[in-house]
UniProtKB/Swiss-Prot annotation:
Biased composition (Low complexity): 378-409, 469-494, 516-526, 718-729, 775-788, 840-852, 871-880
Basic and acidic residues bias spans: 328-338, 665-675
Chain intervals for the UniProt region annotation (Disordered): 1-64, 304-534, 618-730, 769-910, 922-958
Organism of provenance: Aspergillus fumigatus (strain ATCC MYA-4609 / CBS 101355 / FGSC A1100 / Af293) (Neosartorya fumigata)
Highest taxon, organism lineage: Eukaryota
The protein's name in its UniProt record: Autophagy-related protein 13
Recorded family membership: Belongs to the ATG13 family. Fungi subfamily.
Length: 958
């Protein structure tokens, strides 16, 4: 509703006007608590200024102006504030609705907003968070502060937490209200509009309003409820209880409550004022009581989330820590740098002086403090940290203390701004002059790849202008991986602000790795507590709390201490030099291990790589198919199989583990066995455990073969093994007989057969006889004279004639004649056996497995077999050695369960030639008899065991 209109009252009788006024007054008196009154019933009245109607009634009207004015003041009107009205507070506000401005004045109105804690259970606690995030128990604080008489006011609870308190009060009038209110009430109304609008707006900025909104949005604990109550100001002031609004709930320097006043509005009834007192912190929540109690015992909430505002001294120190070479301010024992303390698994460097220093270090520090000259006056009040007191205790710290009695400075990181370091390749013997800039002084270091002979420390110290000891420069050891860094100078370089890895003489990691073979102290990755870094831990960047002096003070100190220009005690310098020599010798001992480790590493690396090399010791084949021709192959793969990354390899280290290094028995003309690809030289082949071996040693020895012990019954199904297989030689005719690399892959490429000593000996003599016919005839006559068996042996001439008729003369064929001279891979005749046989040779009639595994069949034997009549059992004439091994070695050992005696081997020498030509003699028998069931011992696996004993005129060691 708006202000009352000022329209003039209509002319009416005086009696009717008086009756209307009395009626209106009675209505207001009978219903004083009505929430509002209709202003329209006052339209006929004005604002207490009535026009004069009758002069006779002027005296009577003058006697009642105050009552009319009070009736106007007691009107209940609104001030354009849209709020919801409710009847809940009708009874609580009855006192202020029925009050009067003169007779029944209203008491002060108190409105409190509080937290009700009645709904909390036993395991729930109401806590408040301070500005640091620490939790405080609210009820405990209220109980501790309740020292006054616990008299509860009406409608209150002792456990309630008051958030806000509003006080609306109408003061007493100074005088009676004037009779003319027409000019005063509009002004009061306008001021009241501003007041109540400000009250409505400001209430939404208070902490209690924000707390209520947050709880409604986050749906907090239902036990935490916000309520309000209306109190009479007169009864509230009589309470003898601690005010729960102003009581502090936690320790702190902040204000608990604040008060805001909306000012005083003057009115004819008295001054009208509104003020509010509220808590500044309303961050309440409900937590578990046990969790709150445990956090107190554990100290989990202590000093948590407390922002540390830097003090003035800290700001001053931070302002000085700018990039550049200007040294920082002095840091004394009383004000150590807490940021310099660090710890690791093996070491811990604390801030301040070393409390656990050894007695020796303490004595040295005391001696230095006594013998040292007085410091400049500017720094005489506080003695800076010395090397012995700031550095970690131990041998390294003791060395650093002796070498540098002056205060140390924090070393800078090893950083080379140029591509080529100008002066870091050799130790400097002459320091730059004092007029030069200190930041241009390079970090002196010594290379670790070549020895550097330094002059004695006394000579070096005598030429110094600054008077520092010789040990303050890096004394590099000869052949040392990383020289021991000396104590850093009293002023740092331009990169002192960089907190990086401590410098080790100015050598970075790349140069250190390249020079020392990755075995230096800085590049080896040794731990800080290991023995390798024991000598450099005393002068690391983070273990020294050095003084941050100005350059001017440094120059003043040089002027004061003229004795620094000449060494005072040469014996101390010599002792330091000797101690440094011991350290260099220890590092040199590790340097000597580099060559042996590098040689072993290179050898193992070369054996792991399958690369072709003309000087390597791995094996190659000359007759392999074109796809892998000349490639280095493994013992577990066939020559025609492509080499894969998973193919086993033979190490390049000469040892007995080279399982397939075969010996060459020829003496510049005789060829037996296989040769290594590295050259015509090879090693002798050890056979069994017997000491008898045919050794023809070549000029050089590269590898030793691992022998295979003889077995009575070889395993029928044996997996391929790279250590037990032999290399198969490939001849030219094999590509014609077995095209397209038709080989079996069910088993290994080939398997080593179990040969005896006599077999190796006969095999060697057989090839010698095939190469030299004269030696063959002599050997035949010697064997014929010693042989006493009934077997009739053909003459050498007949045997040679038969071989020539078949175009397979063993001694004159192009293949064998050339193989005796330049064929590097001669076939080890009889070393192959078909699947399931007794270790015999291959059989052309035994299926594709035997054909594929036939491998190296000599040409003269192949052509001789082609002339036969197609008998399946007579196709195997691999060589006489294989037939002799099957007929003698296998049958005798299988029947008698022991190998033949060496004496029997000597007696049975003639059988070598008899068995070699037995296939040819059997052909003449078969041509004459047409189907005689006798067969040679070199037949297929079906006839080797069944028809071997049916040869007329022949028996085995009868």
């Amino acid at each position: 509703m708006h202000q009352h209109p000022r329209s003039p009252a209509p002319a009416a009788p005086t009696s009717s006007t008086r009756s209307n006024r009395s009626t209106d007054h009675r209505e207001l008196d009978t219903d004083p608590s009505s929430p509002s009154s209709d202003v329209r019933m006052h339209n006929g009245r004005g604002l207490g200024i009535e026009p004069e109607t009758e002069p006779s009634e002027q005296v009577q009207r003058n006697t009642q102006p105050a009552k009319e004015a009070m009736a106007k003041l007691n009107q209940i009107i609104t001030f354009n504030v849209e709020i919801e009205d409710t009847d809940i507070l009708r009874e609580q506000l009855r006192i202020w609705r029925t009050c009067d401005a003169i007779e029944n004045r209203p008491p002060p109105l108190i409105i409190e907003t509080y937290l009700e804690t009645k709904g909390l259970t036993n395991n729930q606690s109401l806590v408040i968070l301070d500005e640091n995030g620490k939790r405080w128990d609210v009820l405990e604080a209220l109980t501790a502060s309740g020292q006054a008489s616990p008299v509860r006011p009406p409608h209150s609870n002792s456990d309630d937490v008051i958030l806000e308190r509003w006080r609306v009060e109408l003061g007493s009038a100074s005088s009676k209200p004037p009779s003319d209110l027409g000019s005063i009430l509009p002004t009061v109304y306008k001021k009241s509009i501003v007041l109540f609008r400000s009250l409505f707006t400001y209430s939404k900025f208070l902490p209690a309003w924000k707390f209520a909104k947050r709880n409604g949005r986050l749906r907090s604990n239902p036990a935490l409820q916000i309520r309000y109550r209306i109190l009479d100001g007169r009864t509230a002031s009589d309470r003898r209880q601690v005010d729960h609004l102003t009581v502090p709930l936690y320790e702190g320097n902040t204000k608990v409550v604040e008060t805001y006043s909306f000012g005083v509005t003057d009115s004819p009834a008295g001054p009208f004022s509104v003020e509010v007192t509220y808590r500044t912190n309303c961050d309440f929540r409900v937590d578990d009581s046990e969790a709150l109690l445990s956090s107190r015992f554990m100290g989990a909430d202590d000093e948590i989330f407390r922002p540390s505002f830097p003090s003035r001294d800290a700001n001053r120190r931070a302002s000085n820590a700018e990039p550049g070479s200007a040294p920082l301010e002095k840091r004394t024992v009383e004000e150590p740098d807490p940021g310099r303390a660090y710890g690791s698994l093996s070491t811990f460097h604390h801030v301040g002086p070393a409390t656990g220093a050894s007695p020796i270090s303490a004595l040295r520090a005391a001696r230095e403090s006594v013998t040292s000259s007085p410091s400049p006056p500017s720094s005489a009040s506080r003695r800076p940290l010395s090397a012995a007191r700031a550095a970690p205790t131990g041998r390294a710290a003791a060395l650093a203390a002796e070498a540098s009695p002056s205060p140390l400075r924090r070393p800078s990181i090893s950083f080379q701004p140029f591509k080529a370091p100008p002066l870091s390749a050799s130790p400097s013997l002459i320091d730059p002059p004092l007029g030069a800039s200190p930041r241009s002084r390079p970090i002196v270091s010594a290379p670790s790849s070549e020895p550097k002979h330094m002059p004695p420390p006394s000579v070096a110290a005598s030429g110094r202008k600054t008077g520092q000891a010789a040990s303050e420069n890096a004394i590099a050891s000869s052949n040392s991986a990383s020289p021991r860094p000396a104590p850093i100078a009293r002023y740092s370089s331009a990169f002192s602000h960089r907190r990086g890895r401590p410098s080790s003489g100015g050598i970075n990691k790349i140069e250190d790795d390249a020079s020392s073979g990755k075995a230096s102290a800085t590049s080896s990755g040794a731990q800080p507590g290991s023995g390798l870094l024991a000598e450099v831990t005393g002068t690391s960047a983070d273990s020294l709390h050095a003084d941050d002096e100005n350059i001017s003070e440094f120059l003043k100190m040089l002027d004061l201490r003229k004795d620094l220009l000449s060494p005072s005690n040469l014996s101390n310098l010599d002792a330091v030099a000797r101690r440094t020599t011991v350290t260099s010798a220890a590092l040199t001992r590790f340097q000597r291990m580099r060559d042996s480790n590098a040689a072993l590493s290179e050898s193992m690396s070369s054996s792991l790589l399958l690369q072709r090399s003309s000087n390597a010791s791995s094996k190659q084949l000359s007759g392999v198919p074109p796809m892998v021709a000349g490639a280095s192959v493994s013992t577990a793969s066939s020559p025609g199989k492509p080499i894969s990354p998973h193919t086993p390899h033979t190490p390049a280290i000469p040892s007995r583990l080279s399982s397939n290094s075969i010996v060459d028995y020829n003496d510049h003309g005789h060829s037996d066995g296989r040769l290594l690809h590295g050259g015509p030289t090879s090693l002798p082949e050890d056979t069994t455990g017997e000491e008898t071996a045919l050794v023809h040693r070549p000029p050089t020895v590269t590898a030793i073969d691992i022998p295979t012990s003889p077995r009575l019954f070889p395993p029928t199904y044996r997996r391929s093994s790279s250590a037990a297989q032999n290399r198969r030689s490939v001849v030219a005719d094999e590509e014609e007989i077995f095209p397209f690399n038709m080989r079996s892959v069910s088993l290994g490429a080939e398997e080593r057969t179990n040969v005896s000593l006599s077999t190796l000996h006969r095999r060697h003599e057989y090839h010698n006889a095939a190469t030299n016919p004269e030696q063959q005839q002599e050997s035949q006559r010697a064997s014929s004279s010693s042989d006493q068996g009934p077997t009739a042996l053909p003459s050498p001439a007949k045997r040679e004639t038969r071989s020539q008729g078949d175009a397979t003369v063993s001694g004159q064929t192009p293949e064998l004649s050339s193989s005796a001279n330049h064929n590097l891979y001669q076939p080890r005749l009889g070393q192959f056996r078909s699947r399931g046989s007794f270790g015999g040779a291959h059989s052309l009639s035994s299926g594709s497995s035997s054909l594929a595994r036939g491998g190296g069949i000599p040409t003269y034997l192949t052509e001789r077999d082609n002339d036969r009549d197609g008998n399946a059992s007579g196709s195997n004439s691999g060589n006489s050695t294989t037939e002799e091994r099957r007929g003698f070695g296998r049958r005798v050992s299988a029947g008698r369960n022991y190998p033949p005696h060496p004496s029997q081997v000597e007696e049975d020498e003639p059988l070598l030639f008899a068995m070699s030509d037995f296939g040819a003699s059997r052909r003449s028998f078969e041509e004459g008899r047409q189907g005689n069931h006798g067969a040679d011992f070199g037949g297929s696996r079906r006839g080797s065991g069944r028809r071997g004993a049916g040869v007329p005129g022949f028996h085995v060691w009868s």
